[in-house]
Amino acid sequence: MIGRIVSRLPDRIGTYYEPFFGGGAVFFEMARQGRFKRAVLADLNPDLMNCYSVVKERVDDLLSELRGPAYVYNKEAYLAMRAMGTASLSPVQRAARLLYLARTCFNGLYRLNLAGEFNVPFGKYENPVIVDEPALRAASEALQKATLSCADFSEVLSGIAPGDAA
């Protein structure tokens, strides 16, 4: 599916815009193929964009945090991490929390309740990969050409010019 989407985009792009970044599948494939000079990536989810910012700028700190004792795979640790508020966490801790929850929750689902709290149940996996160092380092490298923002799509696309693509 990703190949079909990417094949519809120009081969060479000045700036690639992705206003609904989410998981970033199109961006990461375009980056792998070297099809743009720079990228503007945005999403309205502040936790998600913080995570990408940390992956881009502080991947070593993130890897170190994820290897800490709080990020073990068991139901008690998961529930404690899920219940933890994010206001007092550093950007690196917030990013690690998001990655941990995504790797250990039911089906990798991201869902917030009306109070803005992550409320996905614990996922039952044999041995989930919580720290995927090669993937995080590759993502960090790809993100070096990107400007990241937590913004509305109309604001993001206002800078598009000839030779750019979204």
Each predicted region: which residue ranges?
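SAM cofactor-binding core of SAM-dependent methyltransferases
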Residues: 7, 12-85
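SAM-dependent nucleic-acid methyltransferase catalytic core
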Residues: 1-2, 11, 56-166
